[in-house]
Amino acid sequence: MATKYEMSKTYQYRKVMKPLLERKRRARINKCLDELKDLMAECVAQTGDAKFEKADILEVTVQHLRKLKESKKHVPANPEQSFRAGYIRAANEVSRALASLPRVDVAFGTTLMTHLGMRLNQLEQPMEQPQAVNTPLSIVCGSSSSSSTYSSASSCSSISPVSSGYASDNESLLQISSPGQVWRPW
């Protein structure tokens, strides 16, 4: 008879605990779905008050994750490709900014975009690797009357440290005579 009593006790325990555990599980699922709905509403720029069904929340999440996965496929693998991709994005942003400004000279915009395009073409050409790392570079400092050649260890007083950051600012003042010259936009 003791076995029957314990079985009924176990049976009663299961009868009470199973629905309680199921309620807790559903509460966890609903809480996570609510959090997911809020997060996805931010990501897809919708209001958080929209009435989404659970299936809608999951579908939007799956779509968003697929878009993220696709965008990561287009990320360049090496630093040169990454630099080129960033350069192209920056040039496109400059183009959009020039188009949106009302009183920009068309000739200026054309010249700037042509310059950026030429620099991009130079970037896309295969670069030569420098042959020797330890050899000093020759720097030619130009002035209105004469040019003087200095080694990389000596200073060049005619070059101003303040510039706009474009290589064209210093082209007449500074010429680096080394094989595999590389242009940098900074």
From Swiss-Prot:
GO terms for biological process: cell differentiation; negative regulation of transcription by RNA polymerase II; nervous system development; regulation of neurogenesis. A motif (WRPW motif) lies at residues 183-186. This is Enhancer of split m7 protein. Coiled coil: none annotated. Transmembrane segments: none annotated. Residues 13-68 form the bHLH domain. PANTHER family: BASIC HELIX-LOOP-HELIX TRANSCRIPTION FACTOR, HES-RELATED. Residues 83-116 form the Orange domain. It is found in: Nucleus. Transcription repression requires formation of a complex with a corepressor protein (Groucho). Forms homodimers. It comes from the Eukaryota.
